[in-house]
Amino acid sequence: MFKSGFVAILGRPNVGKSTFLNHVMGQKIAIMSDKAQSTRNKIMGIYTTETEQIVFIDTPGIHKPKTALGDFMVESAYSTLREVETVLFMVPADEKRGKGDDMIIERLKAARIPVILVINKIDKVHPDQLLEQIDDFRSQMDFKEIVPISALQGNNVETLVQLLKDNLEEGFQYFPEDQITDHPERFLVSEMVREKVLHLTQQEVPHSVAVVVDSMKRDEVTDKVHIRVTIMVERDSQKGIIIGKQGAMLKKIGKLARRDIELMLGDKVYLETWVKVKKNWRDKKLDLADFGYNQKEY
């Protein structure tokens, strides 16, 4: 039986939400994103095992907005309450409960969904101070669980993840097992590769190319971001053009695309490129969606 669920991570700015998500995912998701996006938009971290999938939604820090952008960020964070089954409300152990926390608590009460209080940064306080913090927050709301952690050091993080696993219900695997985020980097990577294909082949295969990012992961051995992409075309003749004589064209496409991708990610990249024929994919709705041309997403 496969189990799955969506979990929001809410809290004031700088309480360690992203640090927690990065630790759970085993890599810095923020590295593979535009800084403005990672701080202003919801970020999805997809944690998948053989039997479970937890889709974490890291949110912008909730604060009193002073600009339209601030309004957007806060509403973006609160909008996740309509999308998830569980909320992790994260607070810092080394700061007392404030007005910002109280504001969030009132919204959480109104949402009527299970809330786990996560007290982060326990490595910074004495156990007595932690107990006071627990009692204070417990007096404000009926939390499903209260879990103290140190996201930076990893203390008790696995316990929290196991708790979430235990509370998952039977469900679908919403994302492929090798996908760890919904970041637009996959889309940008595919566009960079497609741009090189169009540039180098000029008018030979202008409209029949789609690029799918099959996987994008950090290789712990080489410390490179390993990206596998498939260039889709509609005819065998187009496949031959893109591969080129003895693979020369495909190698050139990969070399130029890798350079741009490394500049975007700020990381060393190993880019693996493949070419496949998918006849008449441009006229098939399922193929269009599979290749990233989903009207709802872009």
Curated annotation (Swiss-Prot):
Keyword GTP-binding: yes
Cellular component, GO, one term: cytosol
A Pfam family: KH_2
Segments for region (G1): 11-18
Region (G3): 58-61
Membrane disposition: Peripheral membrane protein
KH type-2 domain sequence ranges: 201-279
Localisation per UniProt entry: Cytoplasm; Cell membrane
Gene Ontology MF: a single term: small ribosomal subunit rRNA binding
PROSITE patterns for this protein: G_ERA, KH_TYPE_2
Chain positions recorded as GTP binding sites: 11-18, 58-62, 120-123
UniProt xrefs under CDD domains: Era, KH-II_Era
Subunit structure: Monomer.
Protein name: GTPase Era
Organism: Streptococcus equi subsp. zooepidemicus (strain H70)
